[in-house]
From Swiss-Prot:
GO BP annotation list: adenylate cyclase-activating G protein-coupled receptor signaling pathway; positive regulation of heart rate; regulation of systemic arterial blood pressure
Keyword hit for DNA-binding: no
Lineage: Eukaryota, Metazoa, Chordata, Craniata, Vertebrata
Protein family membership: Belongs to the adrenomedullin family.
Role of this protein: Probable non-functional remnant of adrenomedullin-5.
Name of the protein: Putative adrenomedullin-5-like protein
Domain of life: Eukaryota
GO cellular component: extracellular region
Gene: ADM5
Compartments where located: Secreted
Species of provenance: Homo sapiens (Human)
Length: 153
């Protein structure tokens, strides 16, 4: 749970910085922001905040196995059989949702197969979203929205 909160705070810190203007985005509809930042509708981190929060919520629900029957005892982290080295033949595309919970991707990978992220296991869509968030040390990517992988909403 603490890891999820830290990831959320990290993403919120990145969203508070605003989006840097790049040559690839010039000429699109712009909305002026404070401190001289220019926001292109739908692509700046502030406008993507709802999407980021959605994926973090999916990450949290998937990690706790919400909507699944649970044995008594402490909460266990959940991952599909493929992520645990099991057979992919029985692997469903989505986990069943209970009482209005969001349908979240159930495909998990370890960060070593995508991008080093302190050894966390994250949904593939979350990893793709994190790859497109720039920091002051890395240039903003040319493509702002990640292309959804199969099984992502």
């Amino acid at each position: 749970m603490t890891i999820h909160i830290l990831i959320l705070l990290l993403l919120l810190a990145f969203s508070a910085q605003g989006d840097l203007d790049t040559a690839a985005r010039r000429g699109q509809h712009q909305v002026p922001q404070h401190r001289g930042h220019v926001c292109y509708l739908g692509v700046c981190r502030t406008h993507r905040l709802a999407e980021i929060i959605y994926w973090i919520r999916c990450l949290h629900q998937g990690a706790l196995g919400e909507g699944q029957p649970r044995a008594p005892g402490p909460l266990q982290l959940w991952a599909p059989p493929v992520a645990r080295g099991g057979s992919p033949a029985r692997f469903p595309g989505f986990r069943p949702a209970a009482r209005g919970l969001a349908q979240c991707p159930a495909r998990w990978v370890t960060s070593g197969t995508a991008r080093p992220l302190l050894g966390f296991s994250l949904p593939i869509c979350m990893l793709e979203l994190l790859l497109h968030i720039s920091s002051p040390l890395t240039p903003a990517p040319e493509t702002v929205f990640p292309s959804p992988s199969p099984g992502c909403d």
